[in-house]
Amino acid sequence: MKFRNPIFLALLSLAFVCSTSTAANLGGEKHAAKGVNCAVCHGTTNPPIAPETATCIQCHDKKALMEKTSKIKPTNPHTSPHYGDDLDCTNCHKMHSPSENYCSQCHNFEYKVP
């Protein structure tokens, strides 16, 4: 089959590149690298739902995380003086976009958020 329209061919190529890069970069690469598929965090609903902290702590031990970050200064981000340990993980940790320092909305803490 011969394509007579170079614009159609270019669009077809672009669609293929975008779809494959989106599938590879949908986020959660760290989880995928460990064999965790999307449904583990997002369920099987369509469209997928954002995971709640209860989902995160099924695999990520909250007490171990608080201990691991206990020496971070000026304060441990996982034991907030405002929220205790009840702050949603997704306030800082984003799998499908850059993570952010939720505390920096009010404070000048220089946390590096994975």
Where are these regions (language model features)?
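Short sequence/structural segments immediately N-terminal
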Residues: 3-8, 16-114
